Amino acid sequence: MSSSTPASHAPEPIWAVLGASGFIGSSLEEALTRAGVTVRFVKAPRLSARSSDASGILAEAAALRDVRQDLSGELAGVDVVINAAGLATPTGADSPELRGANALLPVVIADAADDAGARRFIHLSSAAVQGHRPLLDESPQVEPFSAYSRSKALGEAALAARAPGTCQVTSLRATSVQGASRQTTASLVRVASTPLSSVAGRGESPSPVSSVDALCAFVLAAGRYSGSVPPVILQPWEGATVASVLSAAGGRRPLHLPVWLCRAALRAGYLVSGLLGERLHGTLRRVEMMWFGQRQEPGWAEATGNVPAPRVHQVLEAARKRA
């Protein structure tokens, strides 16, 4: 007499998302759920950090044993941990809270993910850590230019300096992420719809303006990847130029300004901002990106065939239509 045994299925892997209430986190939750991933929401602890160097951040993280233990319990049974928490304040001033959210928290999460036996931890960093470098890449070279970008660079440095465990840690440098419901995108649409919409020269420079759709797809690809993922990966370029971004967002062709005039205006602006404690650095950087954009070097995504479908122009057009 033959007997059959029901096929056993391995349980679906669980992904934990910290910062799920924010713009990126909530978009990730929707994208992961659509992809069939079981998502666990984990509340990120609010931390403050006194230190402004990686060794100091590591020492502060080591002292937070209770926080680490509590977080590890919440991450039990999780395969992939994604940190979308933090303070997204490009124009904000330096503070213990900023360093706590963007530098100390990632280390505490990485330690807790190790304790919980997670396979991979993806920390959402920012391409802003490379500041005015002419070429964005996946190297450890950073040139932060503001309190926000310094705090994100500090987070990357602290993760790189911590003793590695069994959980693979990756900092994912998101570029200028846009979404139809994001306030930053609404501001871009407003500017692009006015005579202030302008580019330097012919406007053919690559723009790192990107879509939240592509970012979520990239996070999913990195999390599911069965091989090793580098310590730093860069969100891929979506093929936009400075002119095409403004045209999609504003529905009109931008004004073309002389390159020398744009550079002179930025030099003067940064000089004044420096005298004001970098108060205008964030705004000036947005103008600089609008005029000149920033090139990106192909990296892990291109090498492994994990480049998501570009959606930036569609996202900007959708934002314009709902404005």
What is the meaning of each model-derived region?
Residues 2-4, 292-323:
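Amphipathic terminal alpha-helices
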Residues 107-147:
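Conserved Rossmann-fold NAD(P)-dependent oxidoreductase catalytic core, especially the SDR/UDP-sugar
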Residues 221-279, 310-323:
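Mid/C-terminal beta-alpha module of Rossmann-like enzyme folds, strongest
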Residues 183-187, 201-223, 230:
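Substrate-positioning beta->alpha
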Residues 15-35:
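N-terminal Rossmann NAD(P)H-binding glycine-rich loop of SDR-like oxidoreductase domains
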Residues 261-307:
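A hydrophobic C-terminal alpha-helical subdomain
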Residues 156-180:
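Conserved beta-loop-beta element that borders a ligand/cofactor-binding pocket
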Residues 58-104, 112:
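NAD(P)H-binding glycine-rich loop region in Rossmannoid oxidoreductase-like domains
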